[in-house]
Amino acid sequence: MSVIKMTDLDLAGKRVLIRADLNVPVKDGKVTSDARIVATLPTIKLALEKGAKLMITSHLGRPTEGEYNEEFSLAPVVNYLKDALSCPVRLAKDYLDGVDVAAGELVVLENCRFNKGEKKNTEELAKKYAALCDVFVMDAFGTAHRAEGSTYGVAQFAPIACAGPLLAGELEALGKAMLKPERPMVAIVGGSKVSTKLTVLESLSKIADQLVVGGGIANTFIAAAGHNVGKSLCEHDLLDTAKKLAAETNIPVTTDVVVGTEFSESTPATIKSVSDVTDGDMIFDIGPDSAKALADIIMNAKTILWNGPVGVFEFDQFSAGTKVIAEAIAASPAFSIAGGGDTLAAIDKFGIADKVSYISTGGGAFLEFVEGKVLPAVAMLEQRAKA
C-alpha cells in the first residue's frame, strides 16, 4: 500500500490537522479507559517536535449530528492531554471558519460529529476541514472503513493527505499477516455466530494454511461434523456452509469440550468427549486435548492472526481454552496480530499484550480489512499519493 507518511514530511510551521481515534469512555467528566489516547500520544508528540501548528479532532460517542451536546464533548480528552503532555491544550468549539494556532501549539477541535454533514461526507464540510490545514494526517484506523467528512472528504481536498504513524503501522502489520504471510499461516476466529464472521471465514479460508474456529462458531462446525451440541449456541441453518468450509480448508476438529447446563457464572464445568454431549448440555469452551492440539499448531506457525476467543473466557471455569491459545501465541516466535474487542479483553485478562507482535486498534476496520474489503479512507490516501 503506497501512501504518503507523516514521518516523511517536513511539518515545521505547517498547519497540521490530525484525525485521531479519541473515542474513549467518559464518566463524570473523566476518561475511564485511556488506551486510544495513549496510542495517539506518539503521533501528537512527533508532530509538535517537528514544529507543526497542530490541530487534532475525533468523534466521541454518537451525538445527534449538527447539535452541540456537552455529554459528548472532547473536554475530558483535552484535560487528559494537558496532563499527559505537560503543556497547554486548547479546545476549539467553533472552528470551521478557521483556527489560530502557533507553531508547537496543540488545539483540539471539538467532536467532529457535532458538524452537520460529517457522516454523509458533504463536500461543503469536507472543504471546510481541508481549508484548516496544509497537511491532513489520517491516524484513526478504527474509522478508516467509513467514508466520512473527517476521514475521507478532508483527505480528498487537503493540500497534502498522509497516514499517521498509527495508521501506517496498522496497515503494515495487516499487510504482513494477510497479503504476504510467512507460512505456515494460522488464523484463529472465535465469536458467537458464523453469520457475523462468514465473510471473514471465507476470506481467511483462502489465505490460511490452518483455520481454527472457536466459541459459538465452533459449535456450528461440531454440529456439521454430525455431533450433538445440545442446547449450545449453534446456527443449524448454516451447517452446509460449515461443511463446505471444512471441506475446502484445514479446520482442526474439536475432540473434547467443556460444558455447563446454563449460561451463568456459577454453572459447574464438565469436560466431555465431543461425542458424549447430551441434549441438556451447553458447550462453553474447548477441552484440554483440543486446546493442546491447537497450541501445537500455533507453536509451529510463522504467522498468526487472532480474532475472537475460543470459549466464554469471562467465566473462569470456561476460560482455560482461550488461556492456552493466548499463552501459545505469546510463546510462539511467529509474527502475530490480534484484533477485535473480545480478543483485546482476553489479551488483557491473560496479560500477554507485550508478547503479541501487533494489537490492532480498529474493530470494524480490522474485520473489513480481513474480509478483503477496501477501506475508503485508506483508498483516498493511496489516490492522493499517486497524484
UniProtKB/Swiss-Prot annotation:
GO BP terms: gluconeogenesis; glycolytic process
Subcellular location per the Swiss-Prot or TrEMBL entry: Cytoplasm
Enzyme class per UniProt: transferase
Reaction(s) the record says it catalyses: (2R)-3-phosphoglycerate + ATP = (2R)-3-phospho-glyceroyl phosphate + ADP
Gene Ontology CC terms, in alphabetical order: cytosol
EC number, UniProt record: 2.7.2.3
Positions contributing to substrate binding: D21, L22, N23, R36, H59, L60, G61, R62, R113, R146
Binding site for ATP: K197, E314, G340, G341, D342, T343
Alphabetized GO MF terms: ADP binding; ATP binding; phosphoglycerate kinase activity
SUPFAM superfamilies in the record: Phosphoglycerate kinase
Pathway(s) where this gene product acts: Carbohydrate degradation; glycolysis; pyruvate from D-glyceraldehyde 3-phosphate: step 2/5
Keyword Nucleotide-binding (UniProt): yes
Superkingdom of source: Bacteria
Short name of any one Pfam family annotated for the protein: PGK
Keyword set, alphabetical order: ATP-binding, Cytoplasm, Glycolysis, Kinase, Nucleotide-binding, Transferase
Quaternary structure and partners: Monomer.
PANTHER family cross-referenced by the UniProt entry: PHOSPHOGLYCERATE KINASE, PHOSPHOGLYCERATE KINASE 1, CHLOROPLASTIC-RELATED
Family statement drawn from the similarity comment of this UniProt entry: Belongs to the phosphoglycerate kinase family.
Protein name stated in the entry: Phosphoglycerate kinase
Organism: Aeromonas salmonicida (strain A449)
